[in-house]
Amino acid sequence: MQAEQIVWDQALIEKYNYSGPRYTSYPTALEFNESFGYPDLVRAAGQYPARNLSLYVHIPFCHKLCYYCGCNKVITRHQHKADQYLDYLEQEIKAQAPLFKHRLVTQLHWGGGTPTYLNEAQTRRLMDMLREHFQFAEEGEISIEVDPREIELTMLDVLREVGFNRISLGVQDFNKAVQVAVNREQDNDFIRAMLERARALGFRSTNLDLIYGLPHQNRESFHHTL
């Protein structure tokens, strides 16, 4: 495969080269306060009854800690904890869905944590819960973040079967020294196999997540990753 030269827009870089909040949630944690009660939520939910919905489901569990991560997470290999989490999530879905019962879901995203921490049965259970309580658009975007270190290739078949049409592979960097430094070693050949499998299964969109600013990265190494 021939590498293409990357042209950087320096004006665009300078325009956005400043610090800002890290949106691990929206609104950010600082915006939450006790003055906003359930009646306020009900009023807010009813303000735009004709608008479509975007749903985000947070799966906080990870098998291993990535040293750069600032997301809300639980590091554990006790799979039963995910079952307990889904029990509580089901209560939340049942409580909130009636507020949006006439609105169409055009986007659904599972993030984390590691959404593919869930096994096949747990994945099917969660998707069934969502489809039972929300109305989904036929051509809506249904996406999930995938950790290529902690998934069987056949799990992509399950994800496609339950309705996912977009996957995002958390690669971050292909350089082994960088991977070791952030505790995220992975198999490049397996990532290639995942991309080929996703293409064969008909996923509408497949992307790779990359991070710049990790230990041992430089222009040359990141150019290799790109």
PLM region descriptions:
Residues 54, 67, 142:
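Divalent metal-dependent hydrolysis catalytic cores, especially in the metallo-beta-lactamase
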Residues 73-100, 105-226:
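Conserved non-cysteine loop/helix-boundary elements of the Radical SAM core domain that shape
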Residues 57-73:
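Local cysteine-cluster metal-coordination motifs and their immediate loop/turn environment
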Residues 48-49, 58-60, 101, 200:
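Short glycine/proline-enriched loop/turn "hinge" motifs that connect secondary-structure elements
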Residues 1-53:
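Flexible, acidic/Gly-rich N-terminal and inter-domain linker regions that tether
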Residues 55-57, 169:
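Short beta-strand motif preference
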Residues 28-31, 65, 74-75:
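A short secondary-structure junction motif
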